[in-house]
């Protein structure tokens, strides 16, 4: 399928149809309607890799319940919450842009991709309870989290999330809750934005088209594109290329030969979910519940029990369970992806990952070899009365974590999102994972400001951007002025009303 026949020369080429390409394309076209933008997707459907709703947590990562963003205590013994505040601010920008897209008719029926679901942190055992209490004290000191509730009362937790306490032995427990959390189907959102983009003058998207090579040319880049269904090879020239191809980004950057990729590697981590679609169980859990990471687990494997709304139906997902893999893409990948990504400039980086992260490697192997009974034991840490017959195991996609040199030391695994941009600002790519999707608008704003300085520096574009994302350029992390706090809350309520997350 194609949105139209496409153009020989474009201003912007987007590789991959996930949430990053979708939001960047929509943002740039909104700021400059004259831009010619073309998108290429290797699979036969839009947003079916990491952005697909079944392949990610869909938490609307806002730092509310994800304890992995606040793992440390300061010298005073208090839990440090700065990272959670930063992520919440970034997700606010994301919601504001999506709300703008709804108001402008770019996307319809926001309930198809975003719904309000309470975000809960749940812990057990005295040490964990003390940690959560300190975290709550730090979080509620900021206006973002003023409404966060805390309890150690089992009966209150039973009212919030009954599955967590039924059948649980007598031990200290605690939970925090914010009603204003969200569940996001990033795949559905991406499809809506890309279909809108494809209807605009000078724009197109192509499915079943693999970008096989990137070569510099006088005015930017020449893309070699293989039409997988028709068997033909296309050439496209683009002034700017964004590689938002998930696990496919690193190999394309390597083919482009940009010096900035030297020393980077990719470390793929597979994932799986336990899924329950039994109506009587699903109906009793209306929350996203996060716990603490077990030992060497990467942040993407922090356990959580989530209420999800996917493809028009509700389900419970527990996990994810991490697994060792050498594939970079879930559907379009090959087991040769990791070996073929090893180059003279990054082999030492990858070797040091193996040596310096032996607990992580061992954890991934152990996770991949788990039996169903072992997985159910982990689930019962959250839901003690869980029955094997009510759950099935599905794949949860693949995250390729960025590996790079840092402070002269190679082999650092970055559980986050890395934006790599060439020195001439003609190509930019996204590496890494969580919390990428949720803070996608903040990330694509970074790309736009870095690579389109003339556009973003213009008066008209700045005014448009201010209307789209009112908090852009305003420091909300350290806000203390009552007037600023009240204005922020008005903007936030307006976005939530447009997205159907609160009553107008």
Place the predicted regions along the sequence by residue.
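C-terminal catalytic lobe of FAD-dependent flavoproteins
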Residues: 171-180, 188, 328-457
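Glycine-rich FAD pyrophosphate-binding loop
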Residues: 29-53
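Flavin (primarily FAD) binding-site architecture
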Residues: 243-259
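Dinucleotide-binding Rossmann-like beta1-alpha1 core, especially the glycine-rich loop
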Residues: 58-159, 315, 327, 335-336
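Flavin (FAD/FMN) cofactor-binding and adjacent substrate-gating region
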Residues: 108-117, 122-200, 204-206, 214-219, ...
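Core beta-strand elements of the Rossmann-like FAD/NAD(P) dinucleotide-binding domain
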Residues: 8-10, 229-240
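Short beta-strand to alpha-helix junction loop
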Residues: 82, 86-95, 123-130, 176-198, ...
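Short hydrophobic core segments
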Residues: 13-15, 40, 211, 236-248, ...
